[in-house]
Amino acid sequence: MNAAAKPGWMLGPARGPLAPDVSKRIDVLRIVLIGLIVLAHGARGVTVRIDGTGAGTALMLEILNGHVDFVAVPLFFTISGFLFLRKFELSLAAYGGMLRKKFVSLLIPYVLFNAWLVLWFYFVGSIEVMGSWNFIVSEGLFTKTLGLGTAPINYPLWFLRDLLVVFLLSPVLLLFFKEAPGVGLITLFVLWAGVNPLPYTYYGDFFAFYLGGYLARTRLPLEGVSWWQRAGSLLFVILTAVLVWHQPLGITDESVRNVLFKCNLLLGLVFFWRMSAFRIVRDNFLLHRMARHSFFVYLAHEPTVSIFQTRLLAVWRPVDDLQQIAFYWISGLAVIVFLWIVAELISRVAPALYAVMTGSRRPSKSGNG
């Protein structure tokens, strides 16, 4: 299909540079979302390791871990699709080059941070709520290290595995952009919302990734704050409250609740984009500085969270709501700051090692790199 015969529905690549406002908001969201993921995984220190979770703590976890934090993964897929699909055009050379880059940037860190956990289990010992050498041997060392049909040893890294699969099959998404972009968007959403009740599935991965490319190629104005950002944010707050109290409100059909939950994740994308527009967030020097190492924080946050909480619980057993809520935030934020400092040190002292560990991601010298 040549350019002269290009139909009106075909979504071509967006070749212009990203608007500075959009670039800064994406950058700061990286560390914000990673922070939410660290906090979410650290919640097990309260729900699993502490007897008698308080009512206030349970409500906080239901709102944050049960709804707000769930937005992080689809938003990461949406951002990845936005940045990748906005310019990528399919050719054998381009596809091969992309696969080589993703092998370095995704697969190598994925294998490294799973393999070092295998070594930890073998030489040091088990890690509470994460596993042991006997466990991974019984499950299959190769299978668990690569996460084939199961969660990988370092369970949060399933995201990298799924993202790599999405990149491998990205030519299919480009065909949708060429022939039927709207049909592709609706089809992937229906598959995600209706086929599997789980919030995170390959259907959802592909939908969010495709949505990012769709937004980029339709040139939706993302700068500043538009009416749809305000409306979507308000609806997210309202629907989150409805889902938290769905039983008293009479929403007892689980299939209905699941569909509403996934619709709310979409509203969550808008909510976080709106939040990133606030100057205190978008122009925050510290957040931009930390964003340089957000990938390292993600890669290393487990088993760091589990080990830190084990040590902390040895000297402090939170017994009421105030203490349990404090434990949740202190343990999560402490790990984030600690890993950021570690990343700063490694990137300065051994930049080549840091580049290998993080898939050749060398932090820029600018504050919002």
Give the label of every model feature segment:
Residues 73-85, 164-171, 198-225, 241, ...:
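Specific transmembrane alpha-helix
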Residues 39-42, 186-200, 235-248, 303:
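Aromatic-anchored segments of alpha-helical transmembrane domains
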Residues 4-17, 221-289, 293-296, 303-312, ...:
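Alpha-helical transmembrane segments and terminal signal-anchor/GPI-anchor hydrophobic tails
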Residues 22-23, 90-98, 172-181, 217-229, ...:
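Membrane-interface helix-boundary motifs at transmembrane edges
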Residues 61-74, 148-162, 193-211, 224, ...:
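Interfacial loop-to-helix transition and helix-capping segments at the boundaries
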Residues 45, 311-315:
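A short secondary-structure junction motif
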Residues 1-188, 319-369:
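Membrane-cytosol interface segments of multi-pass membrane proteins
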